[in-house]
UniProtKB/Swiss-Prot annotation:
Record has Oxidoreductase as a keyword: yes
Function: Catalyzes the NADPH-dependent reduction of glutamyl-tRNA(Glu) to glutamate 1-semialdehyde (GSA).
Site (Important for activity): 99
Family: Belongs to the glutamyl-tRNA reductase family.
Catalytic activity: (S)-4-amino-5-oxopentanoate + tRNA(Glu) + NADP(+) = L-glutamyl-tRNA(Glu) + NADPH + H(+)
Species: Trichlorobacter lovleyi (strain ATCC BAA-1151 / DSM 17278 / SZ) (Geobacter lovleyi)
PROSITE patterns attached to this UniProt entry: GLUTR
Note: During catalysis, the active site Cys acts as a nucleophile attacking the alpha-carbonyl group of tRNA-bound glutamate with the formation of a thioester intermediate between enzyme and glutamate, and the concomitant release of tRNA(Glu). The thioester intermediate is finally reduced by direct hydride transfer from NADPH, to form the product GSA.
Single biological process term from Gene Ontology: protoporphyrinogen IX biosynthetic process from glutamate
Positions that bind NADP(+): 189-194
Protein name listed in UniProt: Glutamyl-tRNA reductase
Amino acid sequence: MNIIVVGLSHKTASVDIREKVAFSPNSIEKPLHELVNLDGIVEGIIVSTCNRVEIYATTRDIAGGIARIRRFMAEYHHLAHDLLEPHLYSYHGEEAIRHVFRVASSLDSMVVGEPQILGQIKTSYGYAAEYKSSGIILNRFLHKAFSVAKRVRTETRIASSAVSVSFAAVELARKIFGNLTDKTVLLIGAGEMCELAARHFLTNGAKGVMVTNRTFERAQRLAEEFGGEAIPFDELFLHLHKADIVLTSTGAPHAIITPPDLEEVIKRRRMRPMFLIDIAVPRDIDPAVNEMDAVYLYDMDDLQQVVAANLEGRKQEADKAEAIIAEEIIQFYKWVATLEVTPTIVALRNRFEELRKAELERTLAGWKDAPPDAEKRLEALTSAFMNKLLHQPTTVLKKAGQGNRTDLYLDALRALFDLELGGTDTNESLELEE
């Protein structure tokens, strides 16, 4: 079984392409089911964030699996293949593993070291687990990716000098206005991105924060936390003129602010500049508003320019992180190698366990004067003997799984003990590996 990755990111596609292939978390069950029903695809996970849309899958047919997923990404969103193809990348084997470890560790993020991506991948994995599109390989793979990310964050300083995308938005605002001391900020959305932005804006001297959200209670909670004002979502345009800086990050499928919406707002502001930062994908603000006087709109692609200067300072820590990832790839491959031999090991242990129990029962049945603790003692004795007897062949088989003589050992063992390979329980397989 092979791990493959197909996707696009801020490195290969602009925001107008990324928003066309974004998967909504509110309807993720359908594409997950369609994904694992593709010919040759066994397991699948969809990761869809502002900056990337990626599919992690397992397949026995690498080339065919990659081709089918590339077609799926276009056809599911009713896009022409030619539109999407130039922006897609694909990996398999070691490169796929390395890519996902790097993504989870925030080495492939627009802002290296930002913490949001790990949480986003965990959420995506949660959907796959809930809708049963992931299995033994991707489950183990994603958990390994999470532990690699934790190790990178613990053993390097890659996060200490990192800034989030939200902070990059603040930096962009400072470049426009000079300082934020007399500026009022409006957050449209009450998620993690907006919460981080509120902290950064206030830390950098913003006068006040207003928050609006479709769920008013969430807006109230966030506004209360920062001493700001909560605004009902349907009253957005009654208050928009008060904001010097507007940051949007909602899950809306279409633009919620268009040029006609801003015409009266700009008049009420008496043409004072208005700075709009759209970090949502799909975008919350119609790009056409950038043509209006006194309106300055920036989206996720623009943020990349703000954070570029910070990347060089983190290069040394990133190099340490790459070394950690290289180590962890080796460890993960050792586990993958055991997958081929695990069914044979399980079958061998089951065969010996059957023999052990049969002989134990026969012995106890013929032992008329057996002491009360005889069964307990014999159970412990025979179990310990069996485990010691099987330790060496089990070890040899696991090592064989990492070499080029695997088939030789497996065929010999199956023939010698007439082993039948049934369905191997997932948990039992994992316990054997441990």
